[in-house]
Amino acid sequence: MKTERVNVNVNNQPYPIYIGENLLQDKSLLQRHVKGRQVMIVSNETIAAFYLDPLKAIYQDFQCDTFILPDGEQYKTLEYWERILHKLACNHHRDTTLIALGGGVVGDITGFAAACYQRGVDFIQVPTTLLAQVDASIGGKTAVNHPVGKNLIGAFHQPKAVIIDLNTLNTLPEREFKAGMAEIVKAALIKDEKFFTDLENKMSDLLQRNFIFLQAVIKRAAEIKRDIVNADEKERSGERALLNLGHTFAHAIERLLGYGQWLHGEAVSAGLVLAAQLSHRKNLLDFESLQRICRLLTQISLPIHFPKSINADELLSAMYMDKKVANERLHLILLEDLGHAVVSDQVDDRELKSFLENG
């Protein structure tokens, strides 16, 4: 299989996204984006058991240190971010490179540590979950959670490279693999109706982890995010806000359930359906398109309803702790069509509460 490459260029700071097989064995590739002789690999307990030793062998001629996080969203906190910084402060200089080996949690906290250590050092994303490969590793958003809300403390800090080894998907549990599909569906809904149709036609092969199809859809999802991030790195124009389709609902669900009870992609799936239903209620999205979204997510075995244990008042209150609030108005991403998302602040509290209570 030929390795595919997607080039990102944010503020004249280009970096590549590589997508292929056996990239964790490619010494030349993995060393190419390290400018000094120090690296720190940050991973979690599960991923480290599979891939840490081979990656350390690539850097055997470097000072190579490691930091292993416990597994789970509940450890994406200031406490563990500070522990990473403390280990860096012991003997790492400004030309060190952090390597995030893992899923979205590892990538987010590693990127935030890299953004803050000595006012910013290099880092490389090596995402090992489908969700991280198509979304979290691309675009430079780094953060940790706070008890009040998800990703409330963070920074924009672009990686030097994103290295996606498709072989890491072989060790990904089925639930996490399917959760990652939610972000691929989101990318299609935002910008590319044809891509959405392709997902409908190829989903059976994708769920069988066919690498040829997976490489193609990961590349297309990465291109969609690349184009948006290139145009609006820090959500100034509103373009990047489109990537939050379903996420205002999703972040509230995650927080209310307790981080880790639902996977992020599972919450995103429910959030996508809520956004589509609200779009239909406001006469933006036709009923057949809404049905197609629900059918595709159901085929993946992802949730299309928010949990019954959460009531409308709780969900609405939690949504206001999200970052998509401006001038005390909630900005939601809605759909005018498959492949056409828009930013809206035209949903007031009364309408939103009625929608959440009655659908």
Swiss-Prot record:
It comes from Coxiella burnetii (strain Dugway 5J108-111). NAD(+) binds at residues 71-76, 104-108, 128-129, 141, 150, 168-171. Catalyzes the conversion of 3-deoxy-D-arabino-heptulosonate 7-phosphate (DAHP) to dehydroquinate (DHQ). It catalyses: 7-phospho-2-dehydro-3-deoxy-D-arabino-heptonate = 3-dehydroquinate + phosphate. Keywords: Amino-acid biosynthesis, Aromatic amino acid biosynthesis, Cobalt, Cytoplasm, Lyase, Metal-binding, NAD, Nucleotide-binding, Zinc. GO terms for biological process: amino acid biosynthetic process; aromatic amino acid family biosynthetic process; chorismate biosynthetic process. SUPFAM superfamilies: Dehydroquinate synthase-like (SSF56796). Binds 1 divalent metal cation per subunit. Can use either Co(2+) or Zn(2+). Belongs to the sugar phosphate cyclases superfamily. Dehydroquinate synthase family. One of its GO terms (molecular function) is metal ion binding. Its cofactor is Co(2+); Zn(2+); NAD(+). This is 3-dehydroquinate synthase. Its EC number is 4.2.3.4. The keyword Lyase applies. Pathway: Metabolic intermediate biosynthesis; chorismate biosynthesis; chorismate from D-erythrose 4-phosphate and phosphoenolpyruvate: step 2/7. The keyword Amino-acid biosynthesis applies. Its main location: cytoplasm. The lineage of its organism: Bacteria, Pseudomonadati, Pseudomonadota, Gammaproteobacteria, Legionellales. One of its GO terms (cellular component) is cytoplasm. It is found in: Cytoplasm. Zn(2+) binds at E183, H247, H264.
